Every structure is written in C-alpha cells, then in structure tokens.
Amino acid sequence: MLNSHNTNHNNNSASNSNYNKGHKMHLKSATAKATIMKHKLSKFYGYGWMQVFLLLTVLVIGNQSAWQENIRPKLYVELGPEDVLKFVGNESVVDHFKLVTKDGNSLLIGARNTVFNLSIHDLVEQQRLVWTSPEDDTKMCLVKGKDEEACQNYIRIMVVPSPGRLFVCGTNSFRPMCNTYIISDSNYTLEATKNGQAVCPYDPRHNSTSVLADNELYSGTVADFSGSDPIIYREPLQTEQYDSLSLNAPNFVSSFTQGDFVYFFFRETAVEFINCGKAIYSRVARVCKWDKGGPHRFRNRWTSFLKSRLNCSIPGDYPFYFNEIQSASNLVEGQYGSMSSKLIYGVFNTPSNSIPGSAVCAFALQDIADTFEGQFKEQTGINSNWLPVNNAKVPDPRPGSCHNDSRALPDPTLNFIKTHSLMDENVPAFFSQPILVRTSTIYRFTQIAVDAQIKTPGGKTYDVIFVGTDHGKIIKSVNAESADSADKVTSVVIEEIDVLTKSEPIRNLEIVRTMQYDQPKDGSYDDGKLIIVTDSQVVAIQLHRCHNDKITSCSECVALQDPYCAWDKIAGKCRSHGAPRWLEENYFYQNVATGQHAACPSGKINSKDANAGEQKGFRNDMDLLDSRRQSKDQEIIDNIDKNFEDIINAQYTVETLVMAVLAGSIFSLLVGFFTGYFCGRRCHKDEDDNLPYPDTEYEYFEQRQNVNSFPSSCRIQQEPKLLPQVEEVTYAEPVLLPQPPPPNKMHSPKNTLRKPPMHQMHQGPNSETLFQFQPDGYNTQQSYRGRDNFGTLRSHQVMGDNYRRGDGFSTTRSVKKAVNNTNTRNRSLGRARRQPPRHGIVTQHRSNSPQQQQQQSQQPHSSSGSSPVMSNSSSSPAPPSSSPSPQESPKNCSYIYRD
C-alpha cells in the first residue's frame, strides 16, 4: 500500500506539471483550455470515484470490526401516574433541584432558596428550610450585571456532619455563604455562619463537588466571581492558583474518600495536548487526608496533589475515545469473576461538535492507585512533547505520597510536585472496554447510579446500572458476563423507561432504601426506589417491574435477564428480589448470562396484550423482547415477532447506507453528464462568447473570421460561394478626440486611446485609415470619454440613439465596406492606389441637428478635426493624399460610413 501510494503521488505530480504547462497555453488558445478541462475531468472520473469507493469500503469494514452497535432494550416502559411518585415544589418558579442527601428515612433536596425534607416512602414534604439572599447582596449582584434569576441563593453544598445537624452552602447572589443548622422536629435552628468562598461556587451553573471526610470538608469548585480560579480546597490547603498544570478550566463531577486519600473526578482542557490544539480529557485526582502543606511558601499548598487521565474508549488500533466525563457513581465493591474489586462507574460523552455518543465505563480503585505510583509526565520546553520522566530524576521521598508530617518534606520533593502533578499512564477501563455504548442524536447520558451486587438465585451477583439522559429517559442495563469474568462484556439493556411527562435533562440519580422493609400484599418486598431529579421535579420509581401481570410465562421472565426478577416455579409467576427463599435455586428459575433456562419451555405466546415466547438469536442466542406502548399506566411487553421484524426492517445498516450513497452519487453523475451533453448540442452559444474580451463591456457589431486576412488587391476577401455580387461588412470604428484628457481621468481604466502611428502624422488632412481616428464634427461640446480602439459599449448597442445623446455625445460610427465581385484582381496594387475608385462610392451619414451641420460647414478642415473622405454637403470623391497610406482603400473597394 505504501508503494502504491507513492506511485499515485508521483502520477499526480506529473499531471499537475502538465496542467501548469497547459495553463500557460490557455492565454493563447481556447483549444488548450478545453484540452486541459477534459484532462482534469478524465483524471477525476478516472480514479477520483475509485478513491471514494475504497474509502467508503474501508469505513464499512472498520465499522463492522470495531464499533459496537446500539443494543435494543428488552422493554420500552411508559409509566402511568400511579406508578410514579412525584414532588414538584414551587410551581410558580423553577426550583432547580440538584442535590439529594439521605438522612435516615428522609431525603434532603437542595433547590432555589430552599431545602426540602421529603419522606422516602411517598415523597411527601415533611419540612422546609427557606434561606434567601439578603437584600444588599441581591442589589450588589444586580449591579455587577447579573440577572434576577441568577441573583438567588442556590443550594450547592449539603452534608450531614452528625445526626441532627446540617451543613448547607449556597451561591447567595454571587456571594457564597455557608450555614450550620440544628434539626429539630419542628424547624431548623441556625447555629453558625461562615464565608463560602472556595467551598461553594459563585455561579449556580458552575459544576462543583464536595465530600466530608473525618469531619473535614473537601470541595472542588471555583474561588472567584468570574469563575477563572478553579480550586480543590480543604481549609487552609488549596491547589496552585491560576496554574494550568494543576487545574485547567475543570468541570467537577464527583468526589469520594477511601483509605488515606480523597478522590476527585472532573474533566478539563488537556494541557499535554495544547501543542496540537484543544481537547477535553477526563481526570481523576487525589490528595492525602493527612496533608498539612509544606514549609514556607508551600504552607497553604497541597504537597500530595496528583492527577491522571481516565481512558474510556473503544479498543482498537486507533481507539475511539469518550473524553468528557459527566457523572460518576459511588464506590462499588464486589466480586467480578475470580477477582474482588472496588469499582467506580462513570458516564462519558463525546464532544458536542463530534459524533453524538455516550458510554459507561468502570474503573478499579487499584488501577487508579497503580497509575499514581507510575511515571510522571513532563514538558521540558515550550515546544517540546510531553514525555515520561525517568525514575532516576524522581526525588526521594516520592512526591504525591502520604507522609506523617508533610511540612518536613525537602525542597526537591516540593518543587517537583509543583511542576509534575500529571501522571504519564492513563487509568484503563476495568473490563478493557465500555460496558454500554449508545450513539444517538436524540439524547446523551448525563447521570449514573449503580445498585451494587444484586444476588440472584444460585448465588451470582451483578451490578445493575441506571443511566439518566438529557431527554428525560432512564436506561437500565447490566453486564451479563460480570459474574463470571473480569475482562468480558456482554451488554444487556433491560429497560428504557420514559418517566417524565415532558423531556428535560436529568440532573441527579440516587438509589435509596428504607430502614425497614414493609411487606406488600403480593408477598414480595419493597427493596428500594430510584430517585430522579430534574430542574422542576423530583420523581421516584421502582427499581424493577417483575410483578407485572403481563409477564405470564417462565420464558418471558427469564428472557428479561434482570437480576431483580426470577420465575417462582411454585407460585407460577415472576417474582422480584427480596421474595422469600430468593437465594434458593430450587425454587426459582433465572439465567442472567444467557436469558434461557432449560426448565422453561420455549414457544410463542399468542397473548393479545403481551406477546412473548419465540426466541431469536442475538448475542449468544439471547432472547430480545420488545414492547408496545398501549396505555399511560401499564407496561406492555412484546417478544420479537412480526412487529419487531418490521421495526428492524425500518432501520438501515451501514452497508445499506454506503450502497445508497454510492448509487445516488453515480446516478447524479450520469444525469449531470447527459444533461450537459444534450444541452450543449441543442443550445447555441451567445455571440459574446466569441469576442476577444468577453469579460469587458466592449463587443463587435459584426466580425468575420477573415476580416484581417485579405489579398493584396482588396481589403475584404471575396467568397463567391457565400456572397452575392456585392459584399458588405459593417463594423464599428471608434472616434479619436484630440484634446488631452482631464486630470481626474488620466489614470482611468477606460482611458485606452492611443496615438496614431508616427508614419501617419504627415498625411493629408483628408486622409483616413483604419488606424487613424478622428472626432465627430458635430460633437460641439468636445466631451471626453475614452474608448477602446476595438469596439463599442454594449449599453450603446442596446439603448441605441438614446444613449447619452442629450449632450451631443457620440463615441463611434459604423463603417460599411462594399466589394464589387465583377472586377479583376490581377491589377497591381500600385495602380489601384493611384486611381480613384470607379465602382465604390464613399459616403458619410450623420444624424446631426441642423445647427450642428451649419457649424460644421463653416469650420475649416484641419488635420485634427477634418471630416472623413467626403464632407456632408459633397458627394464627389475626395482627392487622394500625397502619400498613399497602407490602409487606403484599394481599387474595387469602397467605404460607407454610418453613425
């Protein structure tokens, strides 16, 4: 392929060289131009389309081998009002709900000027804490140019440091403040107030995060009004201010604490990519809990801050990256195959100007720790690449580690950590690839919540993933291979749930469970709820829909591959997680890995409302179920049958799309070619296309191909086959004005008049040739307007005599030549010049007014203003000039001048 590419490159160079030569010939010949255009078109049609075809073929092959197709959900669920618990809050204004904190059997929801205390059971409001901005702060916010909506107090930090106490921070009209309240049965009592700078953001649109560890609050936010000073803060320590090596325009996502470290997840502009452009990378950073700062100038700076890139990509020779992290789950600890690991799940998106795509990736805490123990990355010069640092250059003790007293660290370690906070290696995805990939122009992933290690009959455990989108949908999925392998992924999308009555982005997802379970009437247990938070409402739904009475068979229940659901062979119905004897495999049938069970008969269920049964292969012969939205309050399940195949047929594969593009391109090419060909055959060219200067405003009245090629005996070539006895040719003869041009028109582009040749300056006053131009006698105002020697204005031809005739202005006169075809051509040219013309009559016709004619008759003839060969009042031929002119009319040739 390399040799072939070089060959094509050389051929292209030779073609370009030929084209350059032809381009020079284009100035001389129109035929050369046509040849070049044919050469270029033949080159394009010859192998240009072949290159396009090969490119599309490679894209198709690459798509088949690398890209993961969108996985269809088993169920499309549309919930009714009785299936959803909803809290709206203030209906007059948008509350901008965002934070959710669990406090026993209560939910604390942070919103606009308010903290709502809701019951987990039914989302009924129990208490309300109202905290508005002081009037002075609101006025100052408005003076600084913010609108009234932004000059409110949006709750952005909310933690429970101890039972009965609540720590809350709000934007407070772009002047952050933090309050500590004591919670009682009836109200909230203010205990303390402090400045919220570097803890809470100024702008409610800024993303921030916080976590409480060992009664110390760690926050990631911005520390100034403009939002240009990002910071990771724990009083009194902070990251370097205005240092792009530490934080470069970050958007914080989440944070958690584990062991001796606190971890932050965010996305930022990649400083290591700055020499190649701008890109956003996902990061994980950590600081040590025991960090006390350094000595002297490092006393208020972190001495343990490190960060690394999170690699969520589709593997291959050229990985496809999902670079922008949007949300992260809590730390999940579980069994994955033979490994016991602690995982963090995150949702990642492509950039907004890229292919719309989202993915879910998991990262092991051990892999993150190993990355922070690896090599550092550095840039030695401003134009240098970012390269790993040799381990021999790393000082001892190692920067970024936890020390008993960081204030005793030596200067080499402190200086190194200040300029080398970025690690060289990326944190790999735990399963070596994304768990779920979705490409859609309709929605992207925004939030994630994970219900960890759900046990199934037989003892296997699975993490159930709930993903929120910016279109108000919930996607429930599971990795069917996670219980048996730590490096394989079999994605199963169990449900796509349409929860909201109107589409709006999901801001937060939380899985909550009550302290005690209440046993419902059907014998199953209420094992939790999914809390969905948007700007205008808080919604709670069940984690599963196993008890739906539309699931009537064992094969339907098992085919869901839902870890929450299993078929109760004694009761003969689908039961949910938490039912009695749930872990006993002898009482329940379930197979999350394949969706099939040997004890469940397969077959098509011909139910009118819900069809389920006949299984079709999809990823290890898994059963796919579809749904049909039948009502507002029920979920309908459809098996893959004729309806599903109709949906499949309505979608197009990549191969079909490529073939359609190729067929359409070829068809368009053929239609364009034949249309141009037939139009060229039927349509005649305009006369202006044959002019020597078609892009100017000059043109010939009439021109013959042989007007400049004439024999020695006559000016005009006779063509007996085409002409009658007398041949007449009419052409435009410009008029020369003798006076100098005005100063303001000396450099005019239309000032193209030229002086007559020097050898004609001594001719007689009545002589005139084709190259000697004389002014019109009736032009009394002596108006000046430069004209080209070769034609007249198109506007003059179109408008006729009305073109600037109000001031007696005229530019040209028409000359008509008549040739008698009966005379012999054998007479010598010298004799023809000595004798006056016998058969030709030279006349001059002018359309002057009577006053102008009288003035002209009284003026004496001069060399500069003499009339042509004959005057207006005389019809006799003029005497010949003393010296014959090369352009003088020969024998048998005559001129007829016309205006």
UniProtKB/Swiss-Prot annotation:
Keywords linked to the UniProt accession: Cell membrane, Developmental protein, Differentiation, Disulfide bond, Glycoprotein, Membrane, Neurogenesis, Transmembrane, Transmembrane helix
Subcellular compartments: Cell membrane
Q: What is its main location?
A: membrane
Disulfides per UniProt: 141-151, 169-178, 288-402, 312-361
Q: Which domain of life is it from?
A: Eukaryota
Q: Which residues lie on this side of the membrane: Extracellular?
A: 62-657
Question: Where do the TM regions start and end?
Answer: 41-61, 658-678
SUPFAM superfamilies reported for this sequence: Plexin repeat, Sema domain
Naming one, the record's GO cellular component terms include: plasma membrane
**What does gene deletion cause?**
RNAi-mediated knockdown in the neurons of adult males, significantly reduces survival to 30 percent. Adult survival begins to decrease from approximately day 9 post eclosion. Pan-neuronal or glutamatergic neuron-specific RNAi-mediated knockdown decreases adult climbing behavior. Glutamatergic neuron-specific RNAi-mediated knockdown also decreases activity throughout the day (during both light and dark cycles) and results in a significant loss of motor neurons in each thoracic cluster (T1, T2, T3).
Sema domain: residues covered = 74-543
Where is region (Disordered) located?
1-24, 735-766, 798-899
Quote the biased-composition stretches of kind Basic residues, using this chain's numbering: 828-837
**Where in the sequence does UniProt note compositional bias of the Polar residues kind?**
809-827
Keyword Mitochondrion assigned? no
Pfam families (UniProt xref) = PSI, Sema
Quick check: keyword Disulfide bond in the entry?
Answer: yes
Q: From the UniProt record, which GO molecular function terms apply? A: chemorepellent activity; heparin binding; semaphorin receptor binding
* Family assignment from sequence similarity: Belongs to the semaphorin family.
Q: What does this protein do?
A: Involved in growth cone guidance through its role in axonal repulsion. Function in neurons is essential for adult survival, motor neuron survival, and is important for climbing behavior and activity.
Q: What is this protein called?
A: Semaphorin-1A
Species per Swiss-Prot/TrEMBL record: Drosophila melanogaster (Fruit fly)
- Which gene name belongs to this protein? Sema1a
